[in-house]
Amino acid sequence: MPETEHETCSKEWLQSQLRSLDSKDLILLDCRGSHEYSESHIRGAVNLCIPSIVLRRLAVGKIDLASTIKSPELKQRIQSGYKLCWFILYNGEGVPGQNQEIAGAGSLAVAMDSIISILHRRLKQDGCRVVALQDGFNNFRQAFPEWCEDDNQTHSKEIESSRNVQTDQLMGLRSLRISTTQSDSACSSSAESSDCESSSHHHHHHSHHNYNEAPVEIIPGLLFLGNATHSCDSEALKKYNIKYVLNVTPDLPNKFKESGDIKYLQIPITDHYSQDLAIHFPDAIQFIEEARSASSVVLVHCLAGVSRSVTVTLAYLMHTRGLSLNDAFAMVRDRKPDVSPNFHFMQQLLSFESQLRLRPGSRFSCSCIAPDCNCMQTTGFMATHLANATGVSPDSGIEFDRWTPSDTGLK
């Protein structure tokens, strides 16, 4: 076993450890993209495909590694043996340098903006035992293919896992603000819902009081973001010519539905870990497009107007304007600084972004702000997606305090 001051391990050492009785003390983190991981990975490894906006928080110590783990079993392993287990980090091609001594924080012999370097530095700072696979996955697979799982094996395991509780994916975020300060009546009626938008709503009410006084116009003449109060404010709805209301809650009433003056779409989603908001993206996008075609305005709201409604708005911007998740988030936050999406909804958006990139003709180039621009047309991809809507179930409803898009080039 490598000494604690060593940064890297060889493929031979890793294979010997996988064969040993102590393999349960190894935690393998695959730092490649999710697509590469799904094709093949080292047996027992979990994929750590972290959005750059989250990676930065991990780098500066605002969240810990356990906070990004979705699997309860793996999270328990990390928490109980954080400084006892060996963390093995690997990418596709490997890292340069052999067994270099760590002279101080940030001395890992890989690019400083890589996931591996950030993880290595952070784990070392926490006193953990961590090495990077010098040879990389590609060389390891060539030497020891029997210790790798291919796409079919992974897919079979995912199907089996989905029959029970979906706990085999990475990317869960534990609460950074777990206590709620509003009454229970303000939260979702779901007994299992953590629905911490109520906590966030209270927090931002004090920190950014003016953000909640009126719905916020995200796309001029088309889309406003708001909260429960705004959805019941008839004067505000009239003032902004809002004729469509997208209600992203399971239990808030559609107050003016019976009048017939406003068209509603309700997406019954809480912030609980079991919720799949992505599966509703097609309907939500179609509803907003309908409002645009009718030269009307839509209000997208949830309880606090900072998480679920923001997620839907981001999906719309990504699909119709071809924005990346980072760019869409920056655009929305520039107009509404108190946005605070649920971590797992952000992960669903990351998957949605990947879907958009994989479909020819699904990406756009939009620099305008007009709601009737030609670049906001539904494509063939959307038609297919509407017919076969799928999504990734999240595993947390705990509110994330603040998202910050990357400006350092971290990917």
UniProtKB/Swiss-Prot annotation:
An annotated Gene Ontology molecular function: MAP kinase tyrosine/serine/threonine phosphatase activity
Location of the region described as Disordered in the Swiss-Prot/TrEMBL record: 184-209
Regulation: Activity abolished by tyrosine phosphatase inhibitor sodium vanadate. Activated by rl.
Name of the top EC class for this enzyme: hydrolase
Expression by tissue: Ubiquitous expression in eye and wing imaginal disks. Enriched in ovary.
Keyword Cytoplasm part of the UniProt annotation: yes
Keyword Mitochondrion (UniProt): no
Disruption phenotype: Homozygous embryonic lethal, while hypomorphic alleles (reduction in gene dosage) lead to extra photoreceptor cells in the eye, ectopic veins in wings and severe defects in oogenesis in females. Females with the germ line mutation lay only a small number of eggs. The laid eggs are abnormal, approximately 77% of the laid eggs are shorter and some display severe defects in chorion formation. These embryos could not escape the embryonic stage and progress beyond the two-nuclei stage. Null mutants are viable and fertile exhibiting a mild, but significant increase in wing vein material.
Any Gene Ontology biological process: primary branching, open tracheal system
Keywords assigned: Cytoplasm, Hydrolase, Protein phosphatase
Family named by the database record: Belongs to the protein-tyrosine phosphatase family. Non-receptor class dual specificity subfamily.
Complex formation: Interacts (via N-terminal region) with phosphorylated rl.
Protein name: Dual specificity protein phosphatase Mpk3
The species this protein was found in: Drosophila melanogaster
Primary gene name: Mkp3
